[in-house]
Amino acid sequence: ASSLSKGNTLPLALEPAHRHRLSEWPEAGTASICPQKLAAVYLLSSRIGLWRRVLPHISHGMIDFSSVSLRGIDPRDYPVYRAAKGLYCGKLLITSAELADEEQVSSEAFGDILNAMLIARYGKTIIAAEVKK
């Protein structure tokens, strides 16, 4: 049995700017959000540069990763993008060696990736003060 069963949540507090970006997603307040999709959107919206590139490619609840241009992004955002895409697609796209390399993944990004993994597993109940439209 999970230690985060119903009623026992580990709320994640979001920075106001991150919460605002997440609320821009049309499905943010939807009760039936797939946890993996929410985890990917949570992670992508954690970085303003990524979010600006990805948001136009979200339609009808789907993220069209093949249409997202990554040219010119901050190199430290690329592992965050790959982790989000992996969570969304159900594939491991970032290695433990990459996660452990502080030159590739900052401590903040590492924390965001771990939070996204928790969201993918336990759903939106772990996000404190649920995002509302």
Q: Which residues fall in each region the model found?
A:
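Extended, charge-biased low-complexity segments
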Residues: 1-85, 89-133
